[in-house]
Amino acid sequence: MKIRFFSDAYKSKRASHRLRGDVTCQALLEQGYDAKILTDWSEVDADTIVIFLKRSSVASIQRARDQGAKTIYDLCDNKFEEKGEYEPCCQLADLVSVNSVNMGISTKNFTGKNSIVMPDPYERPKLSPRFAPGVDINLLWFGSQSSFKFLPILEVWSRLEKEIGNYCYTMISAKTDRVLGKFKLRQAKGAVSGINFDRLDMREWSWELQGQLLEQTDIVLMPVLTENPRTDTKSANRLIDSLISGRFVITTPLHSYLEFAPYTWQGDYIEGIQWARNNPEQVLDMVTQGQKYVEDNYSARVLSKRFIEEVIDQLRK
């Protein structure tokens, strides 16, 4: 049996392709499966399972089916009302996989189809837990450009300046210069106030830079706006990558985050920063336990094995 991963616009820089394609594929390969990213369509036949990742088309799924393959359509964004291909891709594929329980519920509501939940695995190397802030506490946020939509950015910047004072907030994503430029212009015009740009460090994301900053930071600070219906279907990938990196996470209690509540602060972020400063030993203990939990339950090896076994079981029915 061959397992192939495909997207019509495959890009390893895209987190969903990297985690649900590259990382998962490599884990299956290391366990003895014939798994790879699909580049040669002549390989696709009746002995093939093709997993279609983000930005796949109905035409590609049909092509695989025409060549005799079993097909899985993988969803990790709750955009059924925006992306016209989602529903027909789900209907055409033999199976649907999703990145969270709530994404599965949304998929069922929109398509009537059940799905296999395959959480995102961690991809970062394990680092020693550390929490030893100096006079200025180092805070880190990382995410895709679209993740800015779900961050109460102006509120966070203003509250950090008013209520914390001694901090450096580093934020890495795509096109951060545009975000920074927009808010500098708005503050210059008097449309907003209270932002201390000297305490903000906004940089262009790269996988390597994220790793360097995780080593240096004290806290991963990533509050989330919960009013948007897309937020509660998200996976916990940023949280688990932070924990495996040995860093304390302060965030918002999304559904996929709740199982990590014993190891993170999920609530008011200013209170969380203040509590962490006052309880460094407890922070270290939480991070250490959280890191072990992630290592035991969210490795690509564990998740990919469980996933492919469920896929094979479902396809036999």
Question: What is the role of each PLM region?
Answer:
Residues 94-128:
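Donor nucleotide-sugar binding/catalytic pocket of nucleotide-sugar-dependent glycosyltransferases
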Residues 148, 201-212, 220-241, 251-261:
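Nucleotide-sugar-dependent
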Residues 7, 11-27, 124-127, 132-216:
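Conserved catalytic-core segment of nucleotide-activated headgroup transferases in glycan assembly
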Residues 1-56:
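N-terminal pre-catalytic "stem/leader" segment of glycosyltransferase-like enzymes
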Residues 42-43, 56-57, 102-104, 123, ...:
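Alpha-helix capping/helix-boundary segments
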Residues 125, 278-313:
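A charged, aromatic-enriched C-terminal amphipathic alpha-helix characteristic of glycosyltransferases
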Residues 35-107:
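Extended catalytic core of nucleotide-activated donor transferases of GT-like folds
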